[in-house]
Amino acid sequence: MDRTFAEGALPSSQDGDRARRARILCCITFHFVRRRLESLADVLQALAEFPVAFLEVVLVTNSIDESDASTLRRLALEIMGEGRATVCRVEGLDNPFDLAWQHKPIIAERFLGPTDSGFTHFLYLEDDIRFSFQNFEYFIAAREQLRDAGLLPAFVRTEWSEVAGGLVATDCFW
């Protein structure tokens, strides 16, 4: 894979140390569709490999029956291990696309709440957004470079398009 980084943007050992000390709260939205469990498993596996001080995953899903919730809990337990993931079912969504916003109360209560949560970073992912520890290290390094300018690093989401015959930017609609 060919990548271009700004001078000094490659993560340093100091950035790696900072990344390994992280205590991460991660929400993954997953509108329950059984055929998408494999994609969710891939996202969870990438997170399970993070060599960080602490990582907790909250699977935010639509209103599902207990059997489907049990499937999600078993998948999370198998990949993440005991006590590292929970399932949060959201009831009464007017539109299925509203699920993408249901992590906001979790940020308010668990990350920014009135008591010190101990978390240093929050990640929002969806069941088809694989985020590696290398991505996290890049963010840590780029964040420091951009801090004085008041900017934050970003990622461009891409996915494979059969129609285009290649990768396309997921969030570009022109």
Task: Give residue ranges: language-model regions.
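Acidic ATP/Mg2+-coordinating residue in the GHKL
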Residues: 61-64, 127
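Short, acidic, metal-binding catalytic loop of nucleotide-sugar glycosyltransferases
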Residues: 42-55
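Short beta-strand-to-loop acidic/aromatic patch adjacent to the donor-nucleotide binding site
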Residues: 118-130
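A conserved hydrophobic helix/loop-capping motif in glycosyltransferases and polysaccharide synthases
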Residues: 25-36
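Conserved catalytic core of nucleotide-sugar-dependent glycosyltransferases
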Residues: 132-174
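A short, charged/proline- and glycine-enriched loop
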Residues: 15-26
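Active-site-proximal specificity loops/subdomain of glycosyltransferases
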Residues: 66-120
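Short, charged/polar "capping" segments at the starts of alpha-helices
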Residues: 35-37, 64-72, 163
